Regions:
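Short, Lys/Arg-enriched N-terminal segments with co-localized hydrophobic residues
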Residues: 1-16
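Flexible coil/turn and secondary-structure edge motifs
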Residues: 18-19, 23, 38-239
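Bacterial N-terminal signal peptides
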Residues: 26-37
Length: 239
């Protein structure tokens, strides 16, 4: 987040400033539109299902779907997810800071690293959640009010199986016309994931009344609970 209409960003000190009253009114009016956007029917599940592992373990997935606050808020409430981190992928290490990423010159996308137990949830189900409630995969280089390549839709795969499943699911959804427009999600190998600054971690949890969270992210969490009740779990950060 950084180029949004609902917040002001203090570029001199990486401080997120409170909203002006006029923006609060705009955010309140937009809330109904945001809620409606995630009230649609559940999209079809992946036809190609990755089987659950026979024993507990840890696997890594990395997704980019606009502002990482909301993407993290969704995946940390999915059963089988062990940990999440907000961060940056797609650019170089020396530009992996919020102040640089919001300039839209680094190649980074705001992304979320998802550590999950493959004996509890499959990569296919994570893809289903990602395309169903975490973001709109038909928006090119933006997500809602956030505009720029750092807000692009992307899947950073960590192995050939993740690449195969992601590409197959996108082809399936396009063929089934699951969305009004074609999916623009990039599927690209993960070169590196750089953890974002601490104040971005668990942001939606610690700032539930921030108008941006109310408008853009609460509807996603509500949609997850409504559309995937068997996967939804309450979340509380570990101390």
């Amino acid at each position: 987040p950084g180029s949004v209409d609902f917040r002001r960003y203090h570029k001199s000190g990486d401080v997120l400033m409170p909203l002006a009253p006029s923006l609060r009114r705009a955010a309140a009016g937009f809330l109904l539109l945001a809620a409606a956007a995630f009230a649609g029917p559940l999209i079809p599940p992946p036809a190609t299902e990755a089987p659950l592992a026979s024993r507990p373990g840890k696997e890594t997935a990395v997704f980019a779907g606009g502002c990482f606050w909301g993407t993290q808020a969704v995946f940390q409430r999915v059963k089988g997810v062990l940990a999440t981190s907000a961060g940056y992928s797609g650019g170089e290490a020396h530009t992996a800071t919020y102040r640089q990423v919001v300039t839209e010159t680094t190649g980074h996308a705001e992304s979320v690293q998802v550590i999950y137990d493959p004996s509890l949830i499959s990569y296919s189900k994570l893809l289903w959640v990602f395309f169903s409630v975490a973001h709109d995969p038909t928006q090119l280089n933006r997500q809602g009010p956030d505009v720029g390549t750092s807000y692009r839709s992307a899947i950073f795969y960590t192995n050939a199986e993740q690449e195969r499943l992601a590409k197959a699911y996108i082809a399936q959804l396009d063929a089934q016309k699951a969305f009004p427009k074609r999916i623009v999600t990039e599927v690209t190998p993960l070169k590196a994931f750089y953890r974002a600054e601490n104040y971005h971690q668990d942001y939606a949890y610690y700032n539930p009344d921030n108008p941006y969270i109310e408008v853009c992210d609460r509807p996603k969490i509500a949609a997850l609970k409504r559309q995937f009740p068997e996967l939804f779990v309450d979340y509380k950060p570990k101390k």
